[in-house]
Curated annotation (Swiss-Prot):
The gene is betA. It catalyses: choline + A = betaine aldehyde + AH2; betaine aldehyde + NAD(+) + H2O = glycine betaine + NADH + 2 H(+). The active site is at H474. It comes from Burkholderia orbicola (strain MC0-3). GO terms for biological process: glycine betaine biosynthetic process from choline. This is Oxygen-dependent choline dehydrogenase.
Amino acid sequence: MTTREYDYIICGAGSAGNVLATRLTEDPDVTVLLLEAGGPDYRFDFRTQMPAALAYPLQGRRYNWAYETDPEPHMDNRRMECGRGKGLGGSSLINGMCYIRGNALDYDNWSTHKGLENWTYLDCLPYFKKAETRDVGPNDYHGGSGPVSVTTSKPGVNPLFEAMVDAGVQAGYPRTDDLNGYQQEGFGPMDRTVTPKGRRASTARGYLDQAKVRPNLEIVTHALADRILFDGKRASGVTYLRGSERATAHARREVLVCSGAIASPQLLQRSGVGPGAWLKELDIPVVLDLPGVGQNLQDHLEMYIQYECKEPVSLYPALKWWNQPKIGLEWMLNGTGLGASNHFEAGGFIRTRDDDPWPNIQYHFLPVAINYNGSNAIEMHGFQAHVGSMRSPSRGRVKLRSRDPNDHPSILFNYMAEALDWREFRDAIRATREIMRQPALDRYRGRELNPGADCKSDKELDAFVRARAETAFHPSCSCKMGYDDMAVVDEEGRVHGLDGLRVVDASIMPIITTGNLNAPTIMIAEKIADKIRGRQPLARVDVPYFVANGAPARNVAKAVRQPETV
């Protein structure tokens, strides 16, 4: 057994862990050990580096933990996919590369919780900007010198993107030029974490590339954290496995858990921090009975509303193996072409009811009919909208199955457990159909493939959701930040009741944000990094942002085609 000592030990080299490793080692006298259970982010592997290949990492286990849920009771008892990234970059190595920060009111809502007053949108915005380099340059809402490369949608891409945005506007919803700027609500182009050379902009590329040469950072891959060690109530180190070899590292200052919304509560529970009754079931000595560890689990659920495309402009030919060598060669040599995009270049956020204070539904538009993980491709030209609700009231949990770090935990999201979930998904399907029947899509829109034009009643729509809805791969909130009885960490990520231990990743969100989670997770890590370093927080950015204040969710009077009656 080997033993080493560092100032900080970080468990997990993902969207948050790489940020902390980079920022903490900017201080040359601070030593950091970064542990990652997966391997390197091999830059020659097109599966993780080519944006268009985003489905491939989800189809294996080299880069994907490939978790599976317990039977979901409201989803026909299906065991559902829960992919999480494994390797330097974590889930930023296998995600869909959509750069969505969330709605300003997400953070303003967090700040209404006791003790979280410094998590308003205007407090968070400087850290979003700090992390970002946007290809069209900085402005009041965007950064120009950060580690994360953000690419905007360019004119001349697939005509279906513009048509779908125009259709949303024709249906009476707003147009927005920037889903991460003044107004998230509406339809418009989508920013993506892609480099100017057409490569995936993971946190391994953006952050670790600048930090890994520092002598005060040690990165150990294929290192599976087993347990956090404690000296009384103070975290003192970590034991981890590399193959059959066990090693121990000691932390002079802090242990930072950045393993994500599934593995962070799993590691805490295995270390004796969690609901006491759960730990005793597995004969784990209780360091601290902390009931919220693994509770409050949230995710985004989504459906694919698919249509036949009457004109041959979809990405369907690119799915054929005989066309892929040319696409790959152009990407490899020039960083251009179909391989250089994730093809989520347009989307939007809407409110389905006037009394929704901010958007409750997200759209990703895709010019092909296929599942996110690359399965169930429709054998024809087609297009689809990925549609899902943003802030489900349903809550799940992550619970340890055994003390073996190689065993996956029991995961139950408890999808669709509340009446509001069903109302929002029915609303989403019907709103999508109204968008798709607008004139902008007339030349492209063929028959509805899924759910199918005959699927109309509440009962039929509900059956479709139960059978076909899938995860958007956004698990979060399982070690929530706050000060109520179920909170796990305080406003700086420090675990309640313990010293020298923080959790910093998407698991500490008190409520899931409106949109994809990579950008908010990076922001959280940037913000807490300043706290760890004892630095003054960045000054608030005093910019305006859109608030609906009860305005109609949709201007039906301006809709080009009025709603159909059901």
